[in-house]
A protein has these predicted regions:
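Active-site "lid/cap" and pocket-lining segments within catalytic core domains
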Residues: 1-214, 225
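Active-site-proximal binding-pocket segments
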Residues: 176-307
Length: 307
């Protein structure tokens, strides 16, 4: 994840340089960031994307956002097609469609003069020189907008042929799936861009059925995120409360073998080894891996889900 994040930031830095804008990196938590902003830019407006985070980040970001919202100094952009307030099941599909069909902002063309005072922050180059990746994972995905658009176009034009069937295969999914999940998660391409490009591609496609299947997955992507947005307690509690006490504390030795892909079950172990090597595995196999840990190995999901 850190590697992909650095890939994305590197491309952002390069693109901003072309517009005469340097990318600076702040290091610290949200409280420290708020204090730094108020000292250096007390009248500034904050622009950020909404994200559905785990509890640790959600708590801190909510305090940060509330501070600036009270002063009407924050603009939050919708990242995915989810309801962030006024939750209404009946209106969900309508709201999703409304968000996904909004016009895509055009790229800023003009160079911006850099007239800010010395803000004493590291440039991206200075920041990245301090980052050391212990496990390079050479076969993992490359982050950044350029790669995201390459994947999207190759999927819509060629790789998506047979997607409806191949996406379930641990052998074929690596190439037949869009492989855009990483880029959607890190923001190197927007869901709105993917959806609108998909709508443009469908009429002239020779594999419409596969693209319609992909269209459903874009809805499901937000459907599952909506669950965590609406019920953040699902991070800690089972959806069905009666299941919370079914398992004990877990067996660390069994969990360790599961993580390493050394359970002795060939299919499961092969998937775990693939995941460790590539940093990605298709949705059906992710579901299988977690189901195996919960049902076959009878381990608590609270311990296996973060791993």
């Amino acid at each position: 994840q850190l590697k992909v994040a650095m890939d994305c930031l590197r491309e952002v830095s390069d693109n901003l340089k072309n517009k005469n804008i340097p990318l600076h990196m702040f290091e610290g938590d949200y409280e420290e960031l708020k204090n730094w902003i108020e000292i250096n830019f007390p009248n500034s407006v904050i622009y950020m994307n909404h994200s559905t985070d785990i509890d640790y980040y959600r708590t801190k970001t909510n305090v940060f956002k509330r501070f600036y919202a009270d002063q009407k100094r924050i603009k939050i952009f919708e990242n995915f097609g989810i309801q962030t307030k006024n939750f209404n099941r009946d209106a969900w599909s309508f709201d999703w469609q409304k968000i996904m069909t909004k016009p895509i902002l055009s790229e800023v063309k003009a160079s911006a003069p850099w007239g800010l005072k010395d803000i004493k922050l590291n440039s991206f180059e200075e920041f990245s020189s301090k980052i050391t990746l212990i496990d390079q994972m050479p076969e993992s995905q490359i982050g950044g907008e350029t790669k995201a658009f390459e994947l999207m176009h190759s999927f819509l034009e060629e790789r998506g042929n047979g997607y409806a069937f191949k996406m379930s295969s641990p052998v074929e999914a690596e190439f037949a799936c869009s492989r855009l999940s990483t880029h959607l998660a890190f923001g190197s391409i927007s869901l709105k861009t993917v959806y609108q490009s998909l709508l443009e591609a469908i009429p002239n496609s020779s594999f419409k059925k596969d693209l319609y299947s992909f269209k459903k997955r874009l809805h499901w992507h937000c459907h599952f995120i909506q669950k965590l947005e609406t019920e953040p307690e699902l991070e800690f509690s089972s959806m069905h409360p009666m299941c919370d006490k079914l398992r004990g504390d877990g067996d660390n030795e069994i969990i360790e073998k599961w993580i390493k892909g050394e359970t002795g079950f060939p299919f499961l172990d092969a998937c775990m080894q693939f995941l460790k090597k590539k940093g990605w595995i298709n949705f059906r196999m992710r579901a299988m891996i977690m189901s195996f840990a919960s049902y076959n190995l009878w381990q608590p999901w609270h311990k296996t889900s973060p791993l």
